[in-house]
Each structure stands twice: as structure tokens, then as C-alpha cells.
Amino acid sequence: MEDTKIRLAIYPGTFDPLTNGHISIIHRAKHLFDKIIIAVAQDSGKKPLFSIEERVSMINTTFFSDHMVDVENFSGLLVDYVEKKNAKTILRGLRAVSDFEYEFQTSLMNRKLCPEIETIFLISDYKWLYISSTVVKTVASLGGDVTDFVPENVLICLKTKYCQSKSNLVIT
């Protein structure tokens, strides 16, 4: 009998905002999984620029025609959410050794909490190694051009947020 189980990965994060680095990880992961759920964290301990609704909306807009990608928000323990979705894989992107240190510790804790769940790491494409949501927000807040680092819909949302006080964010 043929195994028809869907290979599902959960890609968690705050995505504040979604960057082209995140998108690259998702597109590459689509070669490994049948379905990817982008799980937007509500209570990550960070103070987001965008509300949970705004972040989910930006990601939904980016992936609106992609049947392999779903977007949901979640709160609480990631492993509880992963179990609820009947998934066995957490997907994470790595840019640098510093990312690995944190992600390694987190994956070990997740494994301790739920041994059936594996964490898969994808190394960021070299074009996006230096890009993070934090860097994008910092550059945008200072009026810098972030056109190359985020999808157009996110660029517009950043402009809206930051142009309330500044009007020099470049949009091409």
C-alpha cells in the first residue's frame, strides 16, 4: 500500500515583517514538504511593530495563490501547536553561527518536550545572510531603501507605518 501521508512542516516565527530571506526558505522547503504552515507567533516575548493580524495579512497576501502554503497564528508552546496540527517537523532558517546557537538550544528543548517532533534547519541563501526583520525595520525606520529585502506588499506596510512620522522611505 502506498504511503499517502502528507509531509507537513511548521515554519514558526514572528515575521515582523516577512522578508525575502523568509520567502527563500519557504520556497526551498516546498521541495522537501507537501505543505508548509507559516505559524505566526502571537506571544514571542518580542514587541512587534505590526499586530498579529497585520503580520498574518502580509504573509497571506504574499502567498495568496500558493496551495502549498497556509498561514495561521498561534500562541503558547510551539510543540503543542505542532502536535495539534499533526505535524512532525519544525522548519527553521539559519543565517549565521549565532542563529544556530539559539536554534540548537530551542530544538533540544522542543525534543525534550515532544520527542516525536524533529527540527529541520535550512541555511539561508547567501543573498539573504545579512537580512533579518530587525535590520529591515531599522533601515526602514531611518528612511533607507528596503525594496530589495521585502515583497512589495510588505514594503507598502512598512511605508505606512514609518511614513506617519517620515515621508522619505523609498518605494520603486
Curated annotation (Swiss-Prot):
User: What InterPro entries does UniProt report for this protein, alphabetically?
Assistant: Cyt_trans-like, PPAT, Rossmann-like_a/b/a_fold
* Pfam families found in the cross-reference section: CTP_transf_like
Which HAMAP family does this entry report, sorted A to Z?
A: PPAT_bact
Q: Where does this one sit in the cell?
A: Cytoplasm
Residues that coordinate or bind substrate: T14, K46, L78, R92
What keywords are assigned to this protein? ATP-binding, Coenzyme A biosynthesis, Cytoplasm, Magnesium, Nucleotide-binding, Nucleotidyltransferase, Transferase
Q: Which family does it belong to?
A: Belongs to the bacterial CoaD family.
Which Gene Ontology terms describe the biological processes this protein takes part in? coenzyme A biosynthetic process
Keyword Glycoprotein in the entry? The reply is: no
Its biological purpose = Reversibly transfers an adenylyl group from ATP to 4'-phosphopantetheine, yielding dephospho-CoA (dPCoA) and pyrophosphate.
Q: What is this protein called?
A: Phosphopantetheine adenylyltransferase
Q: Where is this site: Transition state stabilizer?
A: H22
Q: Note whether Transcription occurs among the keywords.
A: no
Quaternary structure note: Homohexamer.
Q: Which reaction does it catalyse?
A: (R)-4'-phosphopantetheine + ATP + H(+) = 3'-dephospho-CoA + diphosphate
Q: Quick one: signal sequence residues? A: none
